[in-house]
Amino acid sequence: MKKKLLALFLALVMVGAVLPGCGDGSKDPGGQGNNGETGEPVKGGEITVGIAQDLDDSLDPHQTVAAGTREVLFNIFEGLVKPNSDGEMIPAVAEKYTLSEDGTTYTFTLREGVKFHNGQTVTAEDVVYSINRCAAVPEGQEKPLVAAFSAVKSVEALDEKTVAVTIAQRDLEFISYMTAAIIPADYENQATAPVGTGPFRFVSRTPQQDFVMERFEDYWGAPAWLDKVTYKICENADALVMNLNGGSIDLCAHLTSAQASQLNQSFQVLEGTMNLVQAIYLNNQAKPFDNQLVRQALCYAIDRQGIMDMVADGHGTAVGSSIYPAFTKYFLP
């Protein structure tokens, strides 16, 4: 039986590690060569991804708050721009954009022929609606639906393919907020049956069981390799391990090294850093931590590598701040 396409993220930085894997089974994951080993990707097939939480949050991309739900919806929705694998903002629903000399007006040119999953073509009106919706302050609240949009002064459709977004003052981080999902202006069921422009379209959600999506054939960009992805809801990480070994799921993330060690030898495990920092924060206003020498003594006394060896089999990176190593731009001069 083929050795299945495998695993994904690892987790970590300071103290805990996360490992994922994928085991034998009958479904073809569509991402391995003819010999069953990882190689040139092959279009088609399906996978089942195990997750240790129910997606019981709203599926509306502007209202969901759970990180796990956002990870899934990232496949369904896109903004005017989106991050690439290096974290750089690249065009998505927008083909390009320009920034005014004073840094307060972003002018986006929409990509030709981008379609929503319901078959409608994305228009400037949809973009204006989406951004205004994020910037609006819901009744009874003090902040916009999306807090980062509090700086938006106006959103205007200059023509059928051009939208101008003006903010109160220059903010070089604002372009990253334009990853907010573009949604149809006339669609009202986002919370339960989401419609976006991403490479996968929503199929179904069964509470406490699964979330299913399939490749969107009219996607504007490179088509997804897989025909179908099912997220299977598991009770906890131990249940993920059991389902992996049993063959009912093909892939998962966020296991500890101890849990990963329970996987059989047919699994391939990949690991890498993510945005998780485990730290002890001290109250500098309380004695004896108001003394800098005491704080320094604690730092010197703690065996950080020993902690990582004990709880994470040596995985992780000792850091000197709450900024995780993968956030490389922070460390640029």
Stretches with model-predicted labels:
Residues 1-46, 61, 88, 133, ...:
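Short, low-complexity disordered leader/linker segments with a strong preference
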Residues 5, 317-333:
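Structural transition elements
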Residues 48, 123-130, 160-164, 198-199, ...:
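Alpha-helical secondary-structure segments
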Residues 50-101, 132, 195:
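N-terminal lobe/hinge region of extracytoplasmic solute-binding protein
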Residues 85-88, 167, 171-228, 236-238:
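Gly/Pro-rich hinge or "lid" segments in bacterial periplasmic/extracellular proteins
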Residues 95-139, 288:
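Aromatic- and charge-enriched surface segment that lines or borders ligand/interaction sites
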Residues 98, 102, 143-186:
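Surface-exposed binding/hinge segments that line
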Residues 217-261:
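Ligand-site clamp/hinge motif
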